[in-house]
Amino acid sequence: MTRALDAAGADGFCVATLDEAIALREAGIEKPILVLFPIPPEVAREARRRSIAVTASDRRLLDGLLAATGAEPDAPVLEVQLELETGLGRGGFGAGDAWQAASDVSSAPGVRLAGAWTHLQAPGDDGRTAAQVAAFERISGDLAARGIAVGRRHLAASGSLVLGEAVSLDGVRPGLATYGLVPDELLGRAAPNGLRPVLSLHARPVRVADLPAGTGISYGPSFTTARPSRIATLPLGYADGWARALSNRAEALVRGGRVPLVGNVAMDAVMADVTDVPGEPVGVHDEFVLIGQQGDAVITAADVAAARDTNSWEVVTTIAARVPRVYHAASVPRETRTLVGDEVGRRSARA
């Protein structure tokens, strides 16, 4: 996905961890990368070596970063961005300590103040968002008034973008929107945006069996057949990101119709009751869609999120690395990536 965004003209990328940033560098991404969450000061050398910007969100972390970079005065400059606390309550420098932090970064050897950012708590709450934007502008404006070159300022993410109300400043950080998805709480409120989902989740059965009435399905069991039933076993379980909370609460699409997923979700499998699917009996060559569209039927990430009492972010980001990714361009499959980098050992479930 990053390569596609790179080719489309993204100015840079934000990630959560240094490992993710390194993975992008090793994949050939040369544009700026910012790690949003704290890194241990002892690995600051690796960030400097790979030209990866890091975030300082509190005094202890900043002091550690400055000490680590000061010990290597001849190494490449480490870019640091400050997280500002504007109301999320998760981290960042507030109005009382932001100036000292920015001043220390600006005057330290081997370090450059490259930006400041915050994160909006509830983009759909106009009053709360306005207060956070005002706090951010006030803190960053005070730094500029006192002679600090703040660098790139950014606070808007997917929610602001799809509402058409993004305070872009010097950049925006679309996350869920890069999947073509609208944040759950903004469904129905989003401005026209041309987004369409680009992620779908598919599986083919590894077994389809006719079972008698009274058969318990999966561990527990939490589901027992009340009639002779045809049950398909799909090779997708909670180790793949299909949460156990979806047990007996989700559906799949097959041949353009909905079928219930029955029994407790196992580590590596979930079962579908295909007894009522019309036509020839469902077999191992039938394709099931767990997220996405088949014919006129659709199961969205938000549908799955509602079934497991979470949000779409958790649904799409917890699909495990062992689920093969099939990348498309203009609706044509172009590349399949697995844990071993190609189609060797490919499983029957895919995203």
What name fits each language-model region?
Residues 19-20, 39, 57-64, 130-351:
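Active-site anion/phosphate-binding pocket segments in diverse small-molecule metabolic enzymes
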Residues 1-155:
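Active-site-proximal beta-alpha core segment in soluble small-molecule metabolic enzymes
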